[in-house]
């Protein structure tokens, strides 16, 4: 038998065995994951959620967490490739993507319609889309950047609250609306001027919407992060993330833990679920006590 054929006859079965071994390993990992999740109390089982800004950062972590807890999620974002890839990675039976510019009310209304037509209802809105302008002196405040920040962070949230609440009221759904605010909604100093103004305004909107929607059984709350490394706060390469996390930890009150996007998603999950059934109008601050014990110093 020629030497080349002998080598082929030896290697091919080994490659086939390697492939079979990998397939077995991968099947086992999926079985183990499903077994773990089946033992988890799924606090959003059967719920339908919209997550804005859901393609990356806090939003993407929330998409993963909400679907792990039984929800079907519509990822709303302008980052189409990231959003589509995230939906595919989770499974299109659990997550789907809808491209939407939150500053365009028609886009917002259509995103809610898409969700209701696809799933029959809407239970949860996590309004998380936001922008952060560069730090600078108020003496040099860029009013065009100010308008853009307010348009995304406040007007966009207002449009989604409006249309999500309309859907919930029409279907008699006792829903939950959660908005990503910031510790900059509680104090001045930690954030850029336009961002701080927008988050103060958003917190006012949350409290006002809470008053208006309570009669329908709809809860409205905010979740307020301390500094967390996401694509909005850094270029999101390893070096930038590490630097931002080290900076946040050095300034933070709670030592020994680094705030991650996952921690904010977990707070949003609590507010979205019936575990917080009698909580409304609140701003759940996830800052390790930073905002109540000291102010940021320069």
UniProtKB/Swiss-Prot annotation:
UniProt entry keywords in alphabetical sequence: Oxidoreductase
Active site: 195 (proton acceptor)
GO MF annotations in UniProt: copper ion binding; oxidoreductase activity
SUPFAM superfamilies linked to this entry: NAD(P)-binding Rossmann-fold domains
Annotated residues for binding of NAD(+): 50-74
Family: Belongs to the short-chain dehydrogenases/reductases (SDR) family.
Name of protein: Short-chain dehydrogenase reductase 4
Species for this entry: Arabidopsis thaliana (Mouse-ear cress)
Lineage summary: Eukaryota, Viridiplantae, Streptophyta, Embryophyta, Tracheophyta
Gene name per UniProt: SDR4
